[in-house]
């Protein structure tokens, strides 16, 4: 037994001092978190339509992402970088939140290898494989990504062509529990081909990006024989955007088109997920987004997101759906660390059905907050906020107080950070 332990100790010591381990000079630690405490007029914090009316004072969860990465090999222009990330989600209701009873949910978000220096003619281009957040385009104040096909995949990223760079990726994004009436597996394999060109500047201070996403459902033989929802067509999503430097900030205009199973993203604030749960053979949708962050004075800044979307035939019952959403967040800096924050948001959505009926949704949110942050920039984090919010459903949907009220208020404290 002593001989076995001695042998194991020698092996571990040899591994720890091996050249491959010593080559890691530093480990990158990065992540995101939000957590807090609060009450509403009917129990704990209420969360309602935050991708439509804004997230400030309208989040009730505890969420975190912890990432570790390291350059594990470096020789001249060639480098191998490993990246990992796990996430945790809970409602923040208890001291010890575990996976027992789904008190907390843990996920594997990223685990990939990125290689630089092996593509002739462009030492900064990246060959990658594994699972990753892939070039996500974020609208922070409404907590959504309008262009996002993250998942397991592989690709070549940022290969210089002319004034910009091309990225090509193959990513997997399956649909789960499509039709449980089938015996056997009801999950459908879906593969995406993503092609982007970014960096062309038509004039000073501008920046553009265009891309195409092609989604290909890949059902099993049994699923094909069953037909129905499993008989889904390939779909396309086109995205074009132009950004402009403006008064020390920026403004961005985004135009998108999608069809088939991707069309619903245009009115759901989605970023590219395929809808396998409805018949979408004739579906088409369009979306226009305008967003920007403008520092109006040294102390006052303003961030906005305007979304207009329209889609036809996104379900077997729906004729047309229209959405408009506008959210604005203003910030006034009292001192380097203390700020006042206000956020106002509203939306209106109308679904018209083939039988002539319609369904309307709409509402507003108003939030005021006092923030403590590590600096005066609009996105300075970490930040602690004391907030009060009023939420109102203007279409009589009664989403609050167990389906009896159209409005509610929130009061609480939240912290948010990324690093």
UniProtKB/Swiss-Prot annotation:
The keyword tRNA-binding does not apply. InterPro entries: G_neg_Bact_CarbUptk_Porin, Maltoporin, Porin_LamB, Porin_LamB_sf. The record marks 32, 63, 250, 418 as: Greasy slide, important in sugar transport. One of its GO terms (cellular component) is pore complex. The keyword Signal applies. It comes from the Bacteria. Residues 1-23 form the signal peptide. GO terms for molecular function: maltodextrin transmembrane transporter activity; maltose transporting porin activity. It catalyses: beta-maltose(in) = beta-maltose(out). Pfam families: LamB. It is a multi-pass membrane protein. One of its GO terms (biological process) is monoatomic ion transport. It is found in: Cell outer membrane. Keywords: Cell outer membrane, Ion transport, Membrane, Porin, Signal, Sugar transport, Transmembrane, Transmembrane beta strand, Transport. Induction: By maltose. Belongs to the porin LamB (TC 1.B.3) family. Involved in the transport of maltose and maltodextrins. Homotrimer formed of three 18-stranded antiparallel beta-barrels, containing three independent channels. This is Maltoporin 2. It comes from Yersinia pseudotuberculosis serotype O:1b (strain IP 31758). The lineage of its organism: Bacteria, Pseudomonadati, Pseudomonadota, Gammaproteobacteria, Enterobacterales.
């Amino acid at each position: 037994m002593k001989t076995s332990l001695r042998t194991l100790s020698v092996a571990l010591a040899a591994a720890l001092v091996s050249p491959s381990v010593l080559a890691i000079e530093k480990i990158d630690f990065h992540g995101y978190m939000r957590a807090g405490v609060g009450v509403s007029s009917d129990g704990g914090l209420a969360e309602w339509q935050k991708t439509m009316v804004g997230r400030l004072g309208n989040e009730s969860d505890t969420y975190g992402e912890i990432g570790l990465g390291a350059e594990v090999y470096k020789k001249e222009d060639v480098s191998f970088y490993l990246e990992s990330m796990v996430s945790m989600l809970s409602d923040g209701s208890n001291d010890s939140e575990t996976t027992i009873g789904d008190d907390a949910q843990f996920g594997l978000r990223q685990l990939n290898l990125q290689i630089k220096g092996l593509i002739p003619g462009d030492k900064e281009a990246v060959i990658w494989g594994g699972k990753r957040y892939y070039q996500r385009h974020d609208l922070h104040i409404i907590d959504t990504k309008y262009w996002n096909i993250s998942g397991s995949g592989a690709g070549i990223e940022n290969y210089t062509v002319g004034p910009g760079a091309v990225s090509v990726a193959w990513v997997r994004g399956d649909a789960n529990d499509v039709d449980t009436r089938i015996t056997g597996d009801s999950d459908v394999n879906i593969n995406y081909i993503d092609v982007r060109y970014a960096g062309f500047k038509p004039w000073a201070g501008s920046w553009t990006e265009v891309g195409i996403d092609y989604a290909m459902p890949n059902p099993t033989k049994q699923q094909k024989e069953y037909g129905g929802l499993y008989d889904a067509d390939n779909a396309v999503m086109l995205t074009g955007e132009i950004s402009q430097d403006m008064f020390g900030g920026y403004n961005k205009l985004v135009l998108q088109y999608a069809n088939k199973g991707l069309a619903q993203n245009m009115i759901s604030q989605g970023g590219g997920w395929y809808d396998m749960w409805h018949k979408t053979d004739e579906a088409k949708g369009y979306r226009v987004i305008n967003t920007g962050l403008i520092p109006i004075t040294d102390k006052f800044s303003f961030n906005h997101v305007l979304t207009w979307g329209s889609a036809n035939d996104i379900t077997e019952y729906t004729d047309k759906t229209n959405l408009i959403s506008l959210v604005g967040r203003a910030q006034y800096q009292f001192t380097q660390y203390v700020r006042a924050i206000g956020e106002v948001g509203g939306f209106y959505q109308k679904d018209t059905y083939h039988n002539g009926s319609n369904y309307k949704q709409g509402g507003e949110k108003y939030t005021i907050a006092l923030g403590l942050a590590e600096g005066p920039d609009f996105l300075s984090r970490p930040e602690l906020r004391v907030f009060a919010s009023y939420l109102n459903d203007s279409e009589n949907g009664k989403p609050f107080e167990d389906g009896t009220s159209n409005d509610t208020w929130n009061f609480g404290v939240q912290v948010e950070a990324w690093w």
